[in-house]
Amino acid sequence: MNHSRLFAALLLLAFTVASALGQDKEPPVAKEKEPDLMARLKKVKGSFSLIVSFQVKKGEEKTLLEAAKPCIAATLEEKGCKRYELNQDLENPTKFIMIERWDSFKDLEAHLEAEHTKKLLATLAKIADGPPTFVIAKRRVQPKK
């Protein structure tokens, strides 16, 4: 398995991959919890949402927020990105939820190769506290316009 591809391809899972790579072992989360995330995403037809929940080490909340600002601004300009927002849990300030909406898997793949994304993931690799969780969703009720 090409770990650098996995690093980019699994979005916020990348910070756990980076930790594992530093120890010369397989990424535990990729193996145990999300072995087929990219395969699952590839099966999605059309637009989809990706919800990623993760925690950072206590005291690193501001580090994440500062690192996320340029990535969020650049990502919202990317082809196929309809939503890209970082939310912070009000009851547990070390917990964050990234809500993304993409026109296609191909658009998400391009996003994962962007320098601003790689930079954010590199920061997350240093400050993450545990593995992320992922939800792949399809919007079923359209808002009224």
Language-model region placement:
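Short, well-ordered beta-strand segments in beta-rich or mixed alpha/beta enzyme
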Residues: 48-55, 85-112
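Bacterial N-terminal signal peptides
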Residues: 8-18
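Short, glycine- and small/hydrophobic-rich beta-strand elements in well-ordered beta-sheets
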Residues: 39, 72-97
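Short amphipathic alpha-helical segments
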Residues: 58-83, 116-120
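Bacterial N-terminal signal peptides that target proteins for export
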Residues: 1-8
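Glycine-rich beta-strand-turn "strand-cap" elements at beta-sheet edges
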Residues: 23-47, 86-91, 120-145
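Sec/Tat-exported extracytoplasmic proteins
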Residues: 76-79, 112, 124, 128-131
